[in-house]
From Swiss-Prot:
GO terms for molecular function: rRNA binding; structural constituent of ribosome. Part of the 50S ribosomal subunit. Pfam families: Ribosomal_L6 (PF00347). The gene is rplF. It comes from Mycoplasma mycoides subsp. mycoides SC (strain CCUG 32753 / NCTC 10114 / PG1). This protein binds to the 23S rRNA, and is important in its secondary structure. It is located near the subunit interface in the base of the L7/L12 stalk, and near the tRNA binding site of the peptidyltransferase center. GO terms for biological process: cytoplasmic translation. Keywords: Ribonucleoprotein, Ribosomal protein, RNA-binding, rRNA-binding. This is Large ribosomal subunit protein uL6. One of its GO terms (cellular component) is ribosome. HAMAP family: Ribosomal_uL6_B. Belongs to the universal ribosomal protein uL6 family.
């Protein structure tokens, strides 16, 4: 069984943690501020520049929440101090992307261009017409935006065309073999 909930989370320099009543945690750092409401079954404390999570009982559900809470807090601490980024590659003839203000325009081989509204808290850069960098302080939001963009044209297994994560490997298939 994992003991991830028991790890002590080091608070980086320049990061401030506030614990309000009913487990509302606000973490402020150089990149921005994140707030999240956590379960009352988990007690969160700050001691000597460390975040400590303790569970109030030993039920299975509480143990699961303990590890989840610890991981979410670690993500918040990393987000406000360093930030998160996901890189996407676009492969295919005529497939490209461009950022116009708060919209991402994608040409993905459809009869119409795809417009994606960039949500607040996320920044998208088109490094090249075939490379996108999605960055922000909220790990969940950055990952969700990257997944939503990838869903417009997932990589297909025959030629590998589509939108994929930078270090993702596509398992290729062989095409139809000509019959005798």
């Amino acid at each position: 069984m994992s003991r991830i909930g028991n790890r002590l989370l080091q608070i980086p320099n320049g990061v401030e943690v506030k614990i309000a009543e009913n487990n509302l945690i606000t973490i402020t750092g150089s990149k921005g501020t994140l707030s999240k409401q956590f379960s009352p079954l988990i007690k969160i404390e700050v001691e000597e520049n460390k975040l400590i999570t303790k569970r109030l009982n030993e039920q299975k559900h509480t143990k699961q929440l303990h590890g989840t809470t610890n991981s979410l807090l670690q993500g918040m601490l990393t987000g406000v101090s360093e930030g998160f980024k996901k890189e996407l590659q676009i492969t295919g003839v005529g497939y490209k992307a461009a950022v116009n203000g708060s919209k991402l325009n994608l040409s993905l081989g459809y009869s119409h261009p795809v417009e994606f509204e960039i949500p607040k808290g996320v920044e998208i850069q088109a490094v090249k017409p075939t490379e996108l960098v999605i960055s922000g302080i909220d790990k969940q939001l950055v990952g969700q935006v990257a997944a939503n963009i990838r869903a417009y044209r997932k990589p297909e297994p025959y030629k590998g065309k589509g939108i994929k994560y930078k270090n993702e490997t596509i398992i290729r298939k062989e095409g139809k073999a000509a019959g005798k």
